[in-house]
A protein has these predicted regions:
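N-terminal targeting signals for export/organelle localization
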Residues: 1-50, 185-186
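Short loop/turn microsegments at loop-to-beta-strand junctions
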Residues: 44-45, 67, 149-151
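Short active-site neighborhood of thiol/selenol oxidoreductases, capturing the structured segment around
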Residues: 57-87
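Solvent-exposed coil/turn segments that connect beta secondary-structure elements
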Residues: 62-64, 73-74, 108-112, 128-130, ...
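Sec/Tat-exported extracytoplasmic proteins
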Residues: 66, 72, 91-98, 136-143, ...
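Structural microenvironment flanking redox-active thiols in thiol-disulfide oxidoreductases
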Residues: 82-135
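Structural micro-motif
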Residues: 121-123, 133, 137-153
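Thiol-/selenol-based redox modules, centered on thioredoxin-like
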Residues: 146-186
Length: 186
């Protein structure tokens, strides 16, 4: 499956380089992907997190990475499960490419025993120090017209909030291409 995704990405990426959107990445993605919204902010709302080892976890430690941030409250149910299944496919595409070392998938969950599929070196599951509802509301406020579906926040290098993918309706290749575009930013 990974080889197939890598081949698809290779064939899609070659034409993308010929007409790479560069500075127009957000504009191009908004035209291609109805479930995407550009939200270009210089910073992100602060998150008080506990890492897998129980110690404080700071987003600043990932400032050299593109972060794919998702929130998975224990009571979310099917909407979050569907989104995490789609994100697993995105991870497979990213992790079978040179982007593996440039992208971190950060999952914030208050579930007692969160299990989000296969593990990889760039998947980090953290817990909020406060009720998970608080950071979800702070990040949802970045896109007040978004539906009630869970949101995936894409944070560019330097902790710049770049965009939001809504629910599980986006095409995985579009998220992969968007993340790829952000890894190529200088």
């Amino acid at each position: 499956m990974r080889k197939i995704l890598a081949l698809i990405l290779a064939f899609v990426a070659v034409p993308a380089f010929a007409d790479h959107p560069g500075d127009r990445l957000d504009e191009v993605m908004e035209q291609k992907e109805p479930a995407f919204k550009a939200v270009d902010l210089g910073t992100v709302p602060s998150l008080e997190l506990l890492g897998p080892d129980g110690a404080s976890y700071d987003l600043d430690s990932l400032s050299d990475q593109v972060i794919v941030l998702s929130f998975v409250p224990a009571d979310c149910g099917a909407p979050c499960a569907e989104q995490q299944a789609l994100l697993a496919k995105v991870r497979d595409g990213v992790n079978s490419s040179p982007m593996l070392s440039m992208v971190t998938f950060l999952i914030v969950s208050d579930a007692e025993d969160p299990a989000f599929g296969a593990t990889a070196e760039n998947i980090v599951v953290v817990r909020p120090k406060t009720l998970i509802k608080t950071p979800i509301e702070e990040y949802r406020a970045l896109s007040p017209d978004a539906p009630d579906a869970p949101l995936v926040h894409i944070i560019a290098r330097g902790n710049r909030h770049a965009g939001i993918f809504e629910g599980a309706l986006f095409r995985q290749i579009n998220m992969i291409l968007y993340v790829n575009g952000l890894t190529n930013e200088h």
